[in-house]
Amino acid sequence: MTVKKAYGAITRFFRAYSLPESSEYTLISDNLYLIKQRIGGVRTKNDKAEKLRLERCLRREGYVFSTESLISFYTSHGWTLKTAEVYRLSDNICTLLVCAVAEECDRFMKNGRGSTLRMRSAIESLRRLPELEINEVFSALCPTETLFMKVKGFADGDDATRDVYREALIRCARRRREDECVLLSRMT
């Protein structure tokens, strides 16, 4: 389900649900602006493998998101992320959480029942999404980060400086069609 379709399902539920005093309706009405705000900044790319990994992680945690649970899930499976994938991480998580809310809205409209807990957990995770510690994710899941720490300007720099280094690596690796780790190890 795309973000646009998910938001459409949520708004249809909001407009058509016949029990405005129900907890599900109140939950959606209280958080509709938050959902729309999170969707507005999402730039999606069709990376199905990465979305499947994230969905497994979110399902395991009961759609309660935290940076620590994400890192522990990925490290337990031995998965790593490229630099660009870490930057897209919050957008992919947002997409999956909004789709989870939309699926529950569809269930409520079709069957008259669904998982209020899943809906509530996904919305709370959407609230906490800006708290995603990108630097922690980089240091734990991105192998290029350890190579970058050897570079003098990167290790001493602030977040903006580190982002400049990371974005330059992404562009250079795409241009040369090489792996980021191989390219960075040759450059340092």
What are these regions, as identified by a protein language model?
Residues 2-188:
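Basic, amphipathic N-terminal segments
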